[in-house]
Each structure stands twice: as structure tokens, then as C-alpha cells.
Amino acid sequence: ALRVDNGKAAFVVARRTNVNLLASPFLSWSWHVEPHGGTAHPVGLVVGFHGGDPESRSWGGQAYAWLGRDLPPNDRMISLVWGESALRRGAIDPPSKAGRDARYTQRGGIENTRTWWLETVDISEIYARIWPADDLAAARVMFVGISTAGTGAEGAAFISGILISR
């Protein structure tokens, strides 16, 4: 398991994937979240997508468009978070005004910390709920990563076994 601590600066550590969303719609992982300040935990997962948005620019002809230190091209992103309450499980915080980033509460609550949880979600179903007008068949999962909020608030999480499957 990888221990991830929130710090003063936000960061994302991501694995490039570039797989069709409908061909591999399931995301699985295990996590053990330490108690935190009672708000949403500052450590979570993030999934980046490209191609589903009808307004997306093509990058297919740019062979090296997703090499280097930056995140691969993406037009949509979903953060999978540990919410402030177990009752928020399955809740979606709508995208920002730009329509790119949304937040999905996978699990939550202080009462559920200090234990390992195995999670499996259908990211195609979550994507379709957030952006119903997008073309799911054209959407690609560009990366999966671990992110921190960078708020400086105390909060550690152990994350293991991140896997995209069909």
C-alpha cells in the first residue's frame, strides 16, 4: 500500500491509461483512510477522460501529446472522494462552470475510517450521470491517479491495488 499525506501544495500522481471507457468501465482499489477534520478527506482518486465531450479538440495526430510531466490531455475529470458523511455515498457535486471537473463521493464518515475498504465502481455509469449529452462510445480513460487537496489539513490515506477492468 502507498501512504499518501496531504500537504500544503496540491498534487496528482497519475498513471497514463488511454483505454476506451466502455471497454473497461470498472475501477477498483482498496483504501484505508485515517481520521481527519470531519470534512471531505483531502486524499482521493482522480480519473481523467478525453473524447466524450462533443466540443473536444482532437489530439490523435499529436504522437507525443501525452508524454512528459503534465497530465495527459483531458476534457473531463472525476474526483472520487471520501466524504464528510457516510450518508453522502453516491452523491455527485456538479462540474464547475467550465463543465470539466466533478466530484463523486465513494465513501465517507469518520466512523468508517481506520479500516480497509475494497471499492469497485462503474466509472462509465458515473460519467453518464454527470455528462448525459456526451458520447460514451468516444470517451477514453486517459489516466487514473491519486490526488491531494493541498489544504495543509491533516489527513493520510493508504491506497492499494488500483485497477481498471471490464
Model region roles, listed by residue range:
Residues A1-V12:
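Short carbohydrate-recognition loop motifs
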Residues A23-P35, M142-T148:
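A short beta-strand element within beta-rich, extracytoplasmic domains
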Residues V43-L45, K97-G109, T113-A156:
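Extracellular beta-strand ligand-recognition surfaces/modules
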Residues G37-H50, E55-R57:
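Beta-strand acidic-aromatic groove motif in beta-rich domains, primarily in extracellular
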Residues S30-H36, H50, S124:
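Solvent-exposed strand-to-loop "edge" motifs in beta-rich extracellular domains
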Residues V144, S160-I164:
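Extracellular beta-strand elements of beta-rich domains used
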Residues R16-L27, I110-T113, A137-A138:
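Extracellular/lumenal carbohydrate-interaction signature centered on repeated Trp-anchored short motifs
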Residues G52-G99:
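Extracellular/luminal beta-rich ligand-recognition
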